Amino acid sequence: MAPKAEKKPAEKKPTEEKAEKKPRAEKRVPGKEGGEKKGKKKAKKSVETYKIYIFKVLKQVHPDIGISSKAMSIMNSFINDIFEKLAAEAAKLARYNKKPTITSREIQTSVRLVLPGELAKHAVSEGTKAVTKFTSS
């Protein structure tokens, strides 16, 4: 029975050690181990924008004019909205004709329906030119 009495004081020592380990855990958060985690960076989500292309067109039309980031964001949103409208209209046309695919014809018709007057005519001519250039190369 005497050995059991000796075990009780031994059990108190690990509890004292656990109390000592708590400050170590606190040190880990701001310590150097956080620096080691910098090696593993999260992969950035690729967000597709039209900013580069908007800028290229701006420089073709007005080489001396710049654009603010807020204006660029508005232009990017505008292009996304127009493309969504065109895609939705092209999808409707494909469904009406009971076709499973959206072809250049559906896109051309949706451009004529979504865009007004002269803008539609210019868009159709530029689109036709782009498709012809793509198929010839």
From Swiss-Prot:
Record InterPro entries: Histone-fold, Histone_H2A/H2B/H3, Histone_H2B, HISTONE_H2B_site
Positions of post-translational N6-acetyllysine modification: K7, K27
Keywords: Acetylation, Chromosome, DNA-binding, Isopeptide bond, Nucleosome core, Nucleus, Ubl conjugation
Region Disordered, residue ranges: 1-45
Listed name of the protein: Histone H2B.4
Subunit structure: The nucleosome is a histone octamer containing two molecules each of H2A, H2B, H3 and H4 assembled in one H3-H4 heterotetramer and two H2A-H2B heterodimers. The octamer wraps approximately 147 bp of DNA.
Keyword Ubl conjugation on entry: yes
Keyword match Membrane: no
GO cellular component terms attached to this protein's record: nucleosome; nucleus
Highest rank taxon of the organism: Eukaryota
Family membership: Belongs to the histone H2B family.
Bias (Basic and acidic residues): 1-37
Annotated function: Core component of nucleosome. Nucleosomes wrap and compact DNA into chromatin, limiting DNA accessibility to the cellular machineries which require DNA as a template. Histones thereby play a central role in transcription regulation, DNA repair, DNA replication and chromosomal stability. DNA accessibility is regulated via a complex set of post-translational modifications of histones, also called histone code, and nucleosome remodeling.
CDD domains: HFD_H2B (cd22910)
Post-translational modifications reported in the UniProt record: Can be acetylated to form H2BK6ac and H2BK33ac.
Chief location: nucleus
Subcellular location: Nucleus; Chromosome
